[in-house]
């Protein structure tokens, strides 16, 4: 239990990233962590899109507003500090039982798996 608590105490959220590629096998394991996350009634209403192509990542970057949470004095991440991949979590709201809680659980599992692989999220 102590190892788990230490893991949870040391995991951090990043808004500036090193420009090191993430191995596809690691990205696939992060996706698997989301896939096996708990969800209401096992409805599986979430879908995932892995974006690894540098060209597509560059197109997505301006659409992501997470850096807006930074205080103005910290500014937005520079071009050499942006993510090298994205995993989009999509909720199929046409399915019964779709809810934000399931997305939160999947995201929590993904961030834990990423951290376990030494990948900031």
Name each model feature, range by range.
Residues 62-65, 69, 92, 116-119:
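Short helix-capping and hinge/turn segments at secondary-structure transitions, especially at repeat
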Residues 30, 34, 87, 93-121:
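Small-aliphatic-rich amphipathic alpha-helix that forms the alpha element of a beta-alpha
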Residues 1-86:
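N-terminal amphipathic, basic helical "cap/leader" segment at the start of enzyme domains
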């Amino acid at each position: 239990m102590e190892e788990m608590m230490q893991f949870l105490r040391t995991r951090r959220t990043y808004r500036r990233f090193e420009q090191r590629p993430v191995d596809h096998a690691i990205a696939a394991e992060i996706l698997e962590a989301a896939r096996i996350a708990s969800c209401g009634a096992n409805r599986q209403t979430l879908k995932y899109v892995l974006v690894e192509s540098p060209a597509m990542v560059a197109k997505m970057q301006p659409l992501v507003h997470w850096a807006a949470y930074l205080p103005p004095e910290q500014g937005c991440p520079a071009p050499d500090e942006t993510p090298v991949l994205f995993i989009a979590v999509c909720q199929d709201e046409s399915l019964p039982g779709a809810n934000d809680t399931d997305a939160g659980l999947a995201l929590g599992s993904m961030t834990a798996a990423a951290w376990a692989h030494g990948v900031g999220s």
